[in-house]
């Protein structure tokens, strides 16, 4: 998808997820402090549950990865929407 850091902005992502009846999303990526943080937060603000496998995200430094994980689960209001896990723990 061609978009900024929030993949809901300027795309049909929200429409597609609604059409599919998705209530939970799994967010992964190589920019923990960019698209992962903003897209995960945007999904939570839209009432979705968000799963973030910590071994499915990366950043320039380990500190950034750890901060983003901490921030997601500790942010006021939407923090409870997030579940941190690992890729091998995700099942469908």
Q: Which sequence ranges carry the predicted segments?
A:
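Active-site-adjacent betaalpha module
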Residues: 1-92
């Amino acid at each position: 998808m061609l978009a900024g850091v929030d993949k809901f902005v300027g795309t049909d992502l929200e429409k597609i997820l609604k059409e599919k009846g998705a209530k939970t999303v799994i967010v992964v990526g190589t920019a923990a402090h960019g698209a992962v943080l903003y897209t995960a937060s945007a999904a939570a603000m839209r009432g979705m549950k968000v799963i973030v496998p910590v071994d499915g995200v990366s950043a320039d430094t380990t500190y950034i990865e750890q901060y983003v994980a901490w921030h997601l689960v500790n942010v006021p209001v939407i923090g409870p929407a997030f579940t941190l896990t690992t890729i091998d723990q995700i099942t469908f």
